[in-house]
């Protein structure tokens, strides 16, 4: 079986043919291939395809690193198709698998440890095998290709892109601090001239723009502030400038104040631009993490971990307390409760929860965020995949977490089974249209013929009925009894009402008041049966006296019981003494 050796160089592809078919099985291969003459005696050049330029060489080598067969390499291997019983030695097993999948190529591939000795000798003495290739040119091309390949790898490295996020969030935090310091300095400096302005305007950007626009407060009549402030604030600012109590300043002082105000405006605009850049980067690199915790919290988590890959290796428990390391170690040292959350506390989902549910929400959010980070870091998407497809896990998880939070807080739940829009809000359902019902066609009815009655067998022997009273007579008797009962009830009610009225007159009360007092027990009857009303005070006194009497009786009973017990004890002692 003929043996061919595929060699990838910085100058091009070389296909070498072994002079000995059993070259790889020889024991003295390493010693014979130690010199250039020995290598030339073992193999010879079959074909060589040179790269056209350095860019072409970079594309070819980058494809080989990924284990892909390029069209240039496939055309070189077409020269071996016509030969029968061919074996091909390849240095990279991944590339060997890709070559084996080429259609119409019946080749036995060899990509194991037996090829290491021959490849070491070929690379060492390559200029002697390829005519017209100087050793100096070969080293120069190898150095240039290695630099280009390293630059290519760094360009598409995910760690390098993470560095952009880390630097952006760090710069954003620094800008916030500097902007706060500069804005406060502008207010303090310009406040000597116009102290009332700081109480009217709270926005730092609007304050700096107004300082640049108006300058001296005496220019309030000629300055148009409609572009900066609404009408209400504009009127109040001009009124305050007219009767301001501030001191006068020179033009040189105003120039320095306005120079600082320009810095505030410039930094604010750049901060807005940087925030937009950070949002776009986070949506491109970590869409699921951004959907769950937001771009700022997600960027701070990545910056704290160092990279997205390092963050994806962290479990949910670590992600939950990331940023609270000092509090964690202090709690472990003092044996107190450990913190429930770190940087993740600033996520909007945890901010919506109340104090009791913040810890639960942090734990659940950290678990979902860890899954989203792993998808962002390790998932391989097609080129046709949209941003919605990449962030589908995070959007769905956020919807479920919002539903869970609403359940914990006792708020109305969002409906399940609703399609979720890319921004995380449920999509509106389609309009339901009610169609008219089909009318019934009466003309299509048909009349069935009467079926012949079938004789049924008797299941039980029939018994002759005995004569009973008519139903009408029974009904009449029942109705008469009911009418008599009703009339008797009415009579009894009337007699009771009449008696109550008489008793109420004797007691000197109305009928309603007499009934109420009678229910409460505030009516007393003498020996003759005449009623009399009792006041609430008298009732309370009577109840107290009754309670005292009950207590006295209980005390007497206890005393008698104690006396009996003492007598029994004395009798027992006497018996023992005897």
UniProtKB/Swiss-Prot annotation:
PROSITE patterns in UniProt: NOP
UniProt keyword annotations, A-Z: Nucleus, Ribonucleoprotein, Ribosome biogenesis, rRNA processing
Domain called Nop: residue spans: 285-410
Location of the protein in the cell: Nucleus, Nucleolus
SS bond partners: none
GO cellular component: box C/D methylation guide snoRNP complex; nucleolus; small-subunit processome
Chief location bin: nucleus
Swiss-Prot/TrEMBL GO biological process terms: box C/D sno(s)RNA 3'-end processing; endonucleolytic cleavage in 5'-ETS of tricistronic rRNA transcript (SSU-rRNA, 5.8S rRNA, LSU-rRNA); endonucleolytic cleavage in ITS1 to separate SSU-rRNA from 5.8S rRNA and LSU-rRNA from tricistronic rRNA transcript (SSU-rRNA, 5.8S rRNA, LSU-rRNA); endonucleolytic cleavage to generate mature 5'-end of SSU-rRNA from (SSU-rRNA, 5.8S rRNA, LSU-rRNA); protein localization to nucleolus; snoRNA guided rRNA 2'-O-methylation
Compositional bias per record (Acidic residues), positions renumbered to this chain: 462-485
Pfam families attached to this UniProt entry: Nop (PF01798), NOP5NT (PF08156)
UniProt region (Disordered), positions on chain: 443-578
Residue ranges, compositional bias (Basic residues): 569-578
GO MF entries: snoRNA binding; snRNA binding
Superkingdom of the source species: Eukaryota
InterPro entries per record: Nop56/Nop58 (IPR045056), NOP58/56_N (IPR012974), Nop_C (IPR042239), Nop_dom (IPR002687), Nop_dom_sf (IPR036070), NOSIC (IPR012976)
Ranges of Basic and acidic residues composition bias in the record: 495-505, 547-561
UniProt similarity note: Belongs to the NOP5/NOP56 family.
Function: Required for pre-18S rRNA processing. May bind microtubules.
Official protein name in the record: Nucleolar protein 58
Species in which this protein is naturally found: Aspergillus oryzae (strain ATCC 42149 / RIB 40)
């Amino acid at each position: 079986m003929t043996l061919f050796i595929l060699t990838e160089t910085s100058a091009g592809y070389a296909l070498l043919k072994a002079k000995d078919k059993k070259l790889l099985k020889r024991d003295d291969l390493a010693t014979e291939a130690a010199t250039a003459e020995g290598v030339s005696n073992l193999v010879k050049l079959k074909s060589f395809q040179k790269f056209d330029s350095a860019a072409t060489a970079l594309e070819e080598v980058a494809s080989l690193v990924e284990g892909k067969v390029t069209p240039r390499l496939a055309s070189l291997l077409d020269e071996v198709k016509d030969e029968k019983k061919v074996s091909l030695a390849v240095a990279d097993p991944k590339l060997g698998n890709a070559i084996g999948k080429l259609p119409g190529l019946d080749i036995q591939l060899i990509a194991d440890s037996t090829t290491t000795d021959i490849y070491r000798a070929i690379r060492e003495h390559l200029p002697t095998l390829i005519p017209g290739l100087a050793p100096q040119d070969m080293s120069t091309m190898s150095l240039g290709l290695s630099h280009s390949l390293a630059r290519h790898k760094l360009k598409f490295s995910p760690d390098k892109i993470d560095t952009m996020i880390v630097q952006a969030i760090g710069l954003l935090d620094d800008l916030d601090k500097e902007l706060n310091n500069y804005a406060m300095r502008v207010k303090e400096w310009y406040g000597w001239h116009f102290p009332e302005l700081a109480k009217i305007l709270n926005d730092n950007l609007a304050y700096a723009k107004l300082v640049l626009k108006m300058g001296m407060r005496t220019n309030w009549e000629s300055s148009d502030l409609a572009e900066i402030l609404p009408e209400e604030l504009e009127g109040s600012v001009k009124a305050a400038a007219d009767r301001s109590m501030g001191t006068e300043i020179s033009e040189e002082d105003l120039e320095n104040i306005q120079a600082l105000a320009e810095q505030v405006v410039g930094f604010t605009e750049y901060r807005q631009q940087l925030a937009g850049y950070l949002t776009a980067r986070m949506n491109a690199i970590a869409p699921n993490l951004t959907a769950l915790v937001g771009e700022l919290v997600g960027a701070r988590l990545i910056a704290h971990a160092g990279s997205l890959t390092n963050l994806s290796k962290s479990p949910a428990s670590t992600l939950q307390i990331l940023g609270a390391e000092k509090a964690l170690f202090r709690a472990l040292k003092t044996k107190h409760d450990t913190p429930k959350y770190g940087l993740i506390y600033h996520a909007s989902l945890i901010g919506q929860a109340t104090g009791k549910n913040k810890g639960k929400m942090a734990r659940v959010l950290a678990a979902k965020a860890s899954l989203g980070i792993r998808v962002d870091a390790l998932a391989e998407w097609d080129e046709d995949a949209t941003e919605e497809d990449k962030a589908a896990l995070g959007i769905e998880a956020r919807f479920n977490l919002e539903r869970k939070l609403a359940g914990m807080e006792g708020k109305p739940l969002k409906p399940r089974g609703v399609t979720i829009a890319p921004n995380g809000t449920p999509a509106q359902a389609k309009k339901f249209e009610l169609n008219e019902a089909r009318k019934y066609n009466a003309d299509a009815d048909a009349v069935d013929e009467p079926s012949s009655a079938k004789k049924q067998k008797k299941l039980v022997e029939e018994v002759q009925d005995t004569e009973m009273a008519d139903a009408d007579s029974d009904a009449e008797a029942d109705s008469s009894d009911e009418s008599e009962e009703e009339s008797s009830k009415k009579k009894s009610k009337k007699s009771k009402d009449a008696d109550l009225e008489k008793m109420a007159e004797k007691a000197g009360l109305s009928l309603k008041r007499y009934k109420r007092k009678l229910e409460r027990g505030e009516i007393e009857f003498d020996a003759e049966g005449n009623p009399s009303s009792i006041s609430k005070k008298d009732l309370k006194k009577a109840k107290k006296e009754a309670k005292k009497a009950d207590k006295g009786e209980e005390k007497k009973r206890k005393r008698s019981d104690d006396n009996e017990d003492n007598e029994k004890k004395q009798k027992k002692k006497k018996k023992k003494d005897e």
